Amino acid sequence: MTFRIDAHQHFWQMASRDGYWPPQTLDAIYRDFGPQDLEPLLARSGVQRTVVVQSLPTQEDTRYLLDVASRTSFVAAVVGWVDLKSTDAPADIASLARDPKFRGIRPMLQDLADDDWIDDPVLEPAIDAMLAHDLAFDALVTPRHLPALLAFARRYPRLRIVIDHAAKPPIASGRSEAWHVAMSELAAHPNVHCKLSGLWTEAGPHPDLLRVEPYVRAVCDWFGASRLIWGSDWPVSRLAGHFGDYGAWLAWCEQCCDRFLGPDARARVFGGNACHFYRIDRPSGDQHAQ
């Protein structure tokens, strides 16, 4: 059986979000989502493990996810949140890292007014703590953040960085020249990886798959079979209308990877690379984790 990891999914409880995204107008995702909702989708799609990623900029949300992960066998890793510019960041990171499933940190860069927030030496104590605890960095960015992310990646070449949702390219508008230039520059750095996730959502509620495909081909070309990591972005993926079907997104991505990287890349893109990036123990006999 093929070993698959969904390297990007979310859980949340609306009562604890205090008006934070999603708004009530997004009725497809304006409700609680937990392991009981995702487990049947994983079973039908042949996905064995997941990485749950924060969606609130609070440590309370991170602690909630760690608690859920401790009671959910299919959750292999948690990517949480820490205020990386706080003087308490190193201690907060050390505290969270005591949990064996805490494997990464994601500042919500897309929601910050300062495009260059990440390009700041003030982050150094926090990044040093991440390196000391062998943690990964998830970059939730849009194209406007990519120049600063490039400077950040150059400053910390030992830090494992993954670009969530391929930096949310402007698929709907098609104005992607700046995205192409910046992503190709980032891909030249071996510590930078890319998540094959969220692209149907970025294409709008009724995506034209022929318009999405060139973006998949681009990240396949840039990051190759060893630095591309598949994720569902569930339940946010439900915003893509009937294209938000979990199994349909997985199958389409597998077909694209077969075409652009070759069938032998599947084991890495859909499982092995996530194992390596997030330090997840792989099943015995799976030789494609790196």
Curated annotation (Swiss-Prot):
GO molecular function ontology, one term from the record: hydrolase activity
EC identifiers of the protein: 3.1.1.120
Pfam families: Amidohydro_2 (PF04909)
Keyword terms, alphabetized: Carbohydrate metabolism, Hydrolase
Function in brief: Catalyzes the hydrolysis of L-fucono-1,5-lactone to L-fuconate. Can also hydrolyze L-fucono-1,4-lactone, L-galactono-1,4-lactone D-arabinono-1,4-lactone and L-xylono-1,4-lactone.
Other facts: It was not possible to determine the kinetic constants for the hydrolysis of L-fucono-1,5-lactone because of chemical instability, and thus, a stable mimic (4-deoxy-L-fucono-1,5-lactone) was utilized.
Name this protein carries in UniProt: L-fucono-1,5-lactonase
Organismal lineage: Bacteria, Pseudomonadati, Pseudomonadota, Betaproteobacteria, Burkholderiales
